[in-house]
Amino acid sequence: MHTFAIVVHATSAIAAFIIGIVFIFQSNTLRQLQLGRAIVVLLMLMEVFLVIAILSHVTSLPTITQIIFGGLVILGGYMIWRAVQAVTVLTKQQQENQLKVIDHVGFVLISLFDGFAIVSALDLQAPGWLVAVIAVGAVGVGIFGINVRKKTLKMQTI
């Protein structure tokens, strides 16, 4: 059960990331709304299967790992909330709110990207300091990318 849950969790996260990238570069609001809803569903699947994966072996995990996984569950819930906020803003169809939508989806993308980077570093048995550097670096790269996209959108509306 644990392996299946991890596979579905990871597949949902990867799909949400890919759709999120497509979303960021989509200019059609209706298409963004459809993609946004898909992101919400995929994040919900990601979260449910994360919880299943954790619960399937929680008693064998060290306390610190249980705390970290608890934090990841909270982060996943917040990511879902941000994706729902993006969909809510899109349903109002006000062009001036486009930057808010990019902020919400951008947060989700940065969180997913950071998760991929951290898991990869951990799987490669990188030392803790390197995992921390990778995590901070991934956030920095993500913020830079989202800000570039927002600047492009601002220039298009002028």
Predicted regions and their residues:
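Alpha-helical membrane insertion/targeting regions
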Residues: M1-I158
